[in-house]
């Protein structure tokens, strides 16, 4: 995306980035490795994360201190400022967190919940009070991985609520004006045009995230 490309006019450093900070939902290795790609950030890279996530990623401090360094910031269940016009809060989940963002000027809200192992009461409330919902669409079924790799963990064991028997009907009833499945695993059949599974999702009024997707509130 052009807005995120380095070496913009007025930028400090040839490999600098307009990314002002990173919000981590958990300490998955995919997230940690992504932080290393931002090592040339100036000034220090700002990371918002739960205490458990920061503890699990202590090792990355010793790596990035030789480059940009890290400025850790705590997250809370109350709305806190992210920028002049955006506030956000944490929704605590088992083994992860979700984030709800709010445009302080328009009042519009967005929920980002890519790792949902359980539909908690707090998460249900956040879904029903958000204008846009980006929700965990990692797996279509509970045993999706075992079908291609015997012995693999189930969806719930990997902290993901499957679509078919978990989130589809729940999101169908959500009043959000846009609902989007994100964090899709490459085994998920909803990625393939023309599949029965994709049709079920689309008939429920739920979008399927794609590369380069932009959402305007």
List where the protein language model places each region.
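Core dinuclear metal-dependent hydrolase active-site scaffold
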Residues: 1-11, 74-128, 211-217
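Pre-active-site segment of Zn-dependent metallo-hydrolases
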Residues: 1-27, 33-41, 119-126
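Divalent metal-coordination and catalytic microenvironments
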Residues: 4, 26, 47, 88, ...
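Short internal beta-strands
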Residues: 20, 45-54, 134-136, 180-182
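Histidine-centered catalytic micro-motifs
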Residues: 22-32, 179-188
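Metal-dependent catalytic neighborhoods of phosphoester/phosphodiester hydrolases
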Residues: 33-42, 189-197
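Flexible, acidic/histidine-containing loops and adjacent segments that form or flank the divalent-metal
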Residues: 43-97
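Cap/insert and terminal regions of metallo-dependent hydrolase folds
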Residues: 107-109, 117-212
